[in-house]
């Protein structure tokens, strides 16, 4: 029976799944927008959102936990210096998943995963 077993297998071993979601989380935090399949996007929430919640409280222990889950010093710095402060007042729901059609090969449902309050296109330039 499958009672109380959460998460998707995605036709991968546990080590492959762990590595894939670690890499996807790093890409998401680096670019703030990624495109992936819908089941992977929904499962990525379970990895990425707790990292942002962890980054709201800056401590050495939390930084070490974040590094253990991302293996990237640059991303840990961005998490604690930028994203943790950006979402300090938000109680969760840091990611947005937008469906974007189907992949042209296997017709897999695709989705964009983005951080909610990301800067779109940069600063506005005033006309002179």
Curated annotation (Swiss-Prot):
Pfam families: Ribosomal_L17. Coiled coil: none annotated. GO terms for biological process: translation. GO terms for molecular function: structural constituent of ribosome. InterPro entries: Ribosomal_bL17 (IPR000456), Ribosomal_bL17_CS (IPR047859), Ribosomal_bL17_sf (IPR036373). The keyword Ribonucleoprotein applies. GO terms for cellular component: cytosolic large ribosomal subunit. Keywords: Ribonucleoprotein, Ribosomal protein. Belongs to the bacterial ribosomal protein bL17 family. Part of the 50S ribosomal subunit. Contacts protein L32. This is Large ribosomal subunit protein bL17. It comes from Pseudomonas fluorescens (strain Pf0-1).
